[in-house]
Amino acid sequence: MKPIKIGVGGPVGAGKTMLVEKLTRYMSDDYSMAVVTNDIYTKEDAKFLMENGVLPSDRIIGVETGGCPHTAIREDASMNFAAVNELVQRHPDVQIVFVESGGDNLAATFSPELADFSIYIIDVAQGEKIPRKGGQGMIKSDLFVINKTDLAPYVGANLDIMASDTRKFRGNKPFVFTNLKKDEGLPDVISWIRKNVCLEGLT
């Protein structure tokens, strides 16, 4: 049985790697998991997960994309496909593979062949107006995450306005506010994955 692939995208510094680390930490007891990370010229995100996460290092592969990171998750995702296939060969039992994109702009989206589901994450420090810009990553993702809510008072961001703008562009599609450093909002993300991706409660 093929694993479910969840793409995690968003700008540099939004919290993609931390989100993946938290999700694997709190869900790996119930699901066999693996991770592919994308960096332009390094494997820093993979290294972070190996050093700080709960998954064994042979369940994590870092891809060096070079050039534009969005190309590696959409137009030419061959390196990511190869990494996913290698992880499945190493661990035939793997059920969920997270594919973390390199930091990119608001328009970045995953190839539907590479990601069965997608999560797009931004952070409050990037500005209250980010949801209002309506990038394709935010609009088309299955789940939208607005991280670092604790910084809102310091950057003058109104979370109510961000929520309103998000609803305007996403309609009824779900979004979650998080402060991943303190795990705030994380249970909502996990619940969404369990219910909508893993279809818990339907069998």
UniProtKB/Swiss-Prot annotation:
Binding site for GTP: 10-17
Chief location bin: cytoplasm
CDD domains (UniProt xref): UreG (cd05540)
InterPro entries from the UniProt entry: CobW/HypB/UreG_nucleotide-bd (IPR003495), P-loop_NTPase (IPR027417), UreG (IPR004400)
GO molecular function annotations of the record: GTP binding; GTPase activity; nickel cation binding
Subcellular location: Cytoplasm
Pfam families found in the cross-reference section: cobW (PF02492)
Cytoplasm in keyword set: yes
Gene Ontology CC terms: cytoplasm
GO biological process: urea catabolic process
UniProt entry keywords in alphabetical sequence: Chaperone, Cytoplasm, GTP-binding, Nickel insertion, Nucleotide-binding
NCBIfam families assigned: ureG
Subunit structure: Homodimer. UreD, UreF and UreG form a complex that acts as a GTP-hydrolysis-dependent molecular chaperone, activating the urease apoprotein by helping to assemble the nickel containing metallocenter of UreC. The UreE protein probably delivers the nickel.
Family (UniProt): Belongs to the SIMIBI class G3E GTPase family. UreG subfamily.
Function: Facilitates the functional incorporation of the urease nickel metallocenter. This process requires GTP hydrolysis, probably effectuated by UreG.
Protein name: Urease accessory protein UreG
Organism field: Lachnoclostridium phytofermentans (strain ATCC 700394 / DSM 18823 / ISDg)
Originating gene: ureG
